[in-house]
Amino acid sequence: MDNTQLNKKLGKILPKVEMPGRYTGGEFNQIVKNWEDIDVRVTLLFPEIYDLGMSNLGLTILYDIINREPNYLAERSFVPWVDMETALREENVPLYSLESKHPLLDFDILAVSLPYESLYTNFLNALDLAHIPIHSNDRTEDHPLVIVGGHSTFNPEPIAPFIDAAVIGEGEEIILDILETYAGFQPGMSTIDKLNRLKKIEGLYIPIFYEPVYNEDGTFSNLEKMVPEAPNQIIKRIVGKLPPPPNKPIVPYIDTVHNRAPLEIMRGCTRGCRFCHAGIVTRPVRERPVDEILETMETLIPNTGYSEIGLLSLSSSDYTQIVPLVEAINERFEGQNIAISLPSLRIESVSVSLMDALSGKRRSGFTLAPEAATERLRNIINKPISDQQLLDTAKEIYQHGWHTIKLYFMIGHPTETLDDVQAIADLSKRVLKVGLQTIGSRA
């Protein structure tokens, strides 16, 4: 099915499904290139619904990096909601890209973001919807190469039968290495020949060149190389310096989970919380200079129309220049009614000076991440914060003019009891009580 036929069928399907804006494309700042003028065509598949996937920073970064190159194109695809999936299957319409409405089968590479393991089943469902064989050994040179990346692919073996390659580490540089190599492939080249060329790229794990070995109890033991030329060890790719951030991200037509402009200010973390995978694999810490952040905001705001900027990192209050940065934003964007969002702050790193700096901006809520509601459990996960520290911090936040505090908790920590779970509600009520005592019914 070509994209002309696909568009005709979509004209019949979309009026019948919930939130058709998930499936139309055409958003502000979307990039559409001439299909015939391109050397390598990539679909960026985020195996979640559009509402969630469009808020993923990694997708935004790769879309920007690939499309800056004149000979490559990147288009987006997401898994549909159940009504749209049913309609696609009934009409035999393959999963397609939003920009050009080409079936995913038409692309050279299917680049899949897998930030967490719960997306594995969505990923396989997306392959099936795209009419791409699920198992890699059932695919031919006529199918796109399926390359996955993201935090959950640091252990790629659970999905190894379904992929051609996995990126281990950060993707900004390796994606261009992959595309440059692919651009040198000859027409009709077999998949195995393509993978033989790609295996020379550092940070790329290609399962076909290895055989997993398991212990008697079924646990994983090691990998045995099936070809001598395969790397003995896959070295994690690390970007030494953060590349320029996207300053013209796509603005969705519909509500997404984060309706704001994203701007990464720091990558990595030194805290070492025992539950946190991202805090380990994204080391070392790299900070974006204040001047670069301010210059990006100068274009990001008019390019998107957003009035809220998310200063993103694993813990933005640990950014060493956070107070000078917020003060500089206050000064440069005074009178523009710009809100600053600092997601998921560590309680012990929230200072009075930071709250003083933030208090001059339009408030969008304050988010703290105790992660566990009892001191015993917080000590176990290496977040040694007392209940009193949390309550004192909450009081300071309320006193500085915030009415809403969001608390992040997780259920399922090792040694957790029902008392620990009940403490989530109890501690939340104590924080609310502090708010009522401090600012009254506005809390």
Predicted regions and their residues:
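N-terminal pre-triad scaffold of radical SAM enzymes
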Residues: 44-48, 66, 250-277, 301, ...
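Helix-enriched interaction subdomains in cytosolic or periplasmic regions
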Residues: 1-19
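Conserved SAM/AdoMet-binding glycine-rich loop
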Residues: 44-45, 298-406, 411-443
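Flexible loop/turn segments at secondary-structure boundaries
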Residues: 50-53, 82-85, 118-120, 153-156, ...
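Iron-sulfur (Fe-S) cluster-binding segments and ferredoxin-like electron-carrier domains
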Residues: 276-292
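Low-complexity, highly charged intrinsically disordered N-terminal segments
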Residues: 42, 46-47, 53-88, 92, ...
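Glycine-rich beta-alpha loop elements in corrinoid/cobalamin-binding modules
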Residues: 79-225
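N-terminal [4Fe-4S]-dependent radical SAM core
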Residues: 13-43, 50-51, 207, 214-262
